């Protein structure tokens, strides 16, 4: 595999439903480069499910084995991952964008609000995959996201938990 293309699976806020994650990770294990969970799994940090999954803690995770934030370096991107509650994401992206700049992140992944969100602020793409269990807000879909990163752009596609495409939730964000 060349490094001019990377695929990231992003999921968040399954709130105790282990089976939905197991199904998802098994489905994508062979086809994506990095699997990322943005917190509120409510599972043990030692769970065998987490093998090959990058993960952070959420406000409902009481196992202190999870990091609060992660910075992942791939051949194409610098990815900052956090749940979002520590950066007041319910009130906008300002606090998180300061942290993103500090981390020199190309891509910021977060959860917490249970709402699908995808926005480029300056050179950085901020993305919330929504909740795979308990969607909130105007888009009532139990969702996750696949990001295909190339040297030119981020290609974002949201999916339902049964692996079907949410067709109007496909976006391309050019890289600077």
Write out the residue ranges for each language-model feature.
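Conserved beta-sheet core of the metallophosphoesterase superfamily
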Residues: 54, 90-151, 155
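Binuclear metal-dependent phosphoesterase catalytic core
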Residues: 4-5, 22-23, 74, 103, ...
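Helix-adjacent hinge/juxtasegments
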Residues: 56-59, 65-106
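Core catalytic region of metal-dependent phosphoesterases/phosphodiesterases
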Residues: 7-76
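Active-site environment of divalent metal-dependent phosphoester hydrolases
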Residues: 15-20, 41-46, 60-66, 87-91, ...
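Active-site-proximal beta-strand elements of phosphoester/diester hydrolases
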Residues: 7-13, 78-85, 125-130
